[in-house]
């Protein structure tokens, strides 16, 4: 899962207030990594730390210790998604929960930091303006609410294979 973990680092290196993209943040982190460690024997922690240090306001930097569970904890997380539309408030709430089954030697699992690239679509497949974003699931369960919707949207989750998880989503035939 090494390549997937590095790709998640890139996704999470997006610079919050600075507005830089994940690719730009990742490139800054790579530059810092080589400045610090060129020619040295290094660890995965050194690499992750450099990416985070180059992007101090990023989702990666603010959750680095928890993100490192991808290197220490075995198994593939199962991500369960559920959506609920409230016509009265014109809002749709997405709830994501995660669970990683026990593996030999690791019966108790901590939540992973999971970037979920997503967007919302109208029933006809038209994108809902302003809905594309990366949600960061870093606990067992979290919810996000999207407002000013005229009808229940269809969620497009894990765009670009943003995380190596198994998605459980009870979608209708139309979705």
Where are these regions (language model features)?
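Catalytic-domain carbohydrate-binding cleft regions of carbohydrate-active enzymes
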Residues: 2, 29-30
């Amino acid at each position: 899962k090494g390549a997937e973990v590095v790709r998640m680092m890139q996704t999470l290196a997006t610079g919050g207030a600075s507005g830089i993209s994940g690719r730009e943040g990742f490139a800054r982190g790579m530059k810092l990594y080589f400045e610090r460690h060129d020619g040295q024997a290094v660890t995965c922690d050194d690499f992750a730390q450099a990416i985070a240090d180059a992007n101090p306001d990023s989702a990666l930097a603010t959750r680095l210790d928890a993100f490192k569970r991808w290197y220490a904890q075995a198994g593939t997380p199962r991500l369960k998604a559920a959506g609920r539309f409230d016509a009265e408030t014109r809002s749709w709430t997405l709830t994501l929960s995660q669970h990683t089954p026990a593996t030999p030697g690791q019966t108790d699992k901590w939540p992973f930091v999971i970037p979920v690239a997503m967007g919302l679509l109208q029933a006809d497949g038209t994108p809902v303006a302003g809905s594309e974003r990366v949600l960061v699931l870093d606990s067992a369960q979290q919810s996000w609410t999207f407002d000013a919707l005229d009808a229940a949207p269809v969620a497009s989750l894990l765009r670009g294979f943003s995380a190596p998880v198994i998605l459980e989503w009870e979608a209708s035939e139309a979705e």
